[in-house]
Regions:
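S-adenosyl-L-methionine-dependent methyltransferase catalytic module, highlighting the catalytic core
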Residues: 5-7, 18-27, 31, 135-143, ...
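A short beta-strand submotif of the Rossmann-like class I SAM-dependent methyltransferase core
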Residues: 127-128
């Protein structure tokens, strides 16, 4: 991992003093916090999203580094939800260690309606690298909208399925997982190949993503059908998170927006800033 920005390193140093926070969680929190403070918060503010005094929810929060960065922008309330109990436990420990107040809960946005206290409650909702795992994109957006205030903001980021590693083949932990564009193989060959993965759960995940195949075009249609206002769309050759993970600067690919096919193959990230109608 490249050298972290000073502000991020201070947070990582704080949680390093805790024996109950492992190196895996420190790593993921560190790059998430860096992404939130160096890119996501400045981007949202540049688009007119008010973070100070805002109620903010991240769906699929992981180790909640992004939430921590947004909390430091003066948010009134931050809530992280995830399907994994370990992620929730880690987030609670990390927030305690860095002295930030947050609420965390296990919640499935597809099968569970939001609790009354969350319904129509949030000014800002984030879905980072989550929506591509949800089987019905439009329905998922509608469920997320239940959490949002009228006029609330939704920030969505995902790797298009046909981008070099959009099939999440890195999960396979085998030689195949190191190769780009394996999702372009015919179904019989692709299926035979990914079933050689070491872990059954990873086989299931890659298979599910194969069924969903979330593309830029599919995402645009889902946004339109869900009646969300599209405020901004950004495409990237190199994702902003690569700066934190690998030291590679973000490179935009917005000129591909109007080139069907090529945009799906070449853009490693698509991000959307959306707004719920008043």
């Amino acid at each position: 991992m490249p050298k972290l920005p000073p502000r991020t390193q201070k947070k990582v140093d704080l949680i390093a003093t805790r024996d109950d926070i492992n190196s895996y969680d420190r790593y993921y929190f560190g790059y998430q916090y860096g992404l939130g403070s160096e890119y996501i918060a400045p981007y949202l503010k540049s688009e007119g999203v008010k973070l100070e005094g805002a109620t903010i929810c991240e769906i699929g929060c992981g180790e909640s580094g992004v939430l921590a960065a947004l909390a430091e922008e003066g948010a009134a309330e931050v809530v992280g939800i995830d399907l994994r109990d370990l992620a929730i436990q880690s987030s609670e420990k990390i927030f305690e260690a860095v002295g930030i107040k947050g609420e965390f809960a296990i919640h499935n946005i597809i099968t569970q309606p939001p609790p009354d206290k969350w319904r129509g409650h949030f000014d800002v909702v984030l879905l980072r690298d989550v929506i591509e795992h949800l089987e019905e994109t439009e329905l998922s957006l509608r469920h997320v909208m239940d959490f949002m205030k009228p006029g609330g903001w939704l920030y969505v980021v995902f790797p298009p399925y046909y981008s070099p590693f959009g099939a999440h083949q890195h999960l396979l932990d085998n030689t195949l997982g190191k190769l780009p564009y394996i999702q372009l193989l015919p179904d019989p060959i692709f299926t035979k190949a990914y079933k050689k993965a070491r872990l059954h759960i990873d086989v299931e995940e890659v298979s599910m993503l194969r069924g969903i195949r979330l593309t830029i075009g599919k995402m645009r249609r889902a946004i339109k059908n869900a009646l969300l206002d599209l405020v901004d769309e950004q495409l990237y050759f190199l994702r902003p998170v690569f700066k934190l993970k690998f030291g590679l600067p973000p490179i935009k690919a917005n000129f591909l927006k109007h080139i069907p096919g090529l945009r799906e193959l070449a853009a490693l990230e698509a991000s959307y800033l959306l707004r719920k109608k008043l």
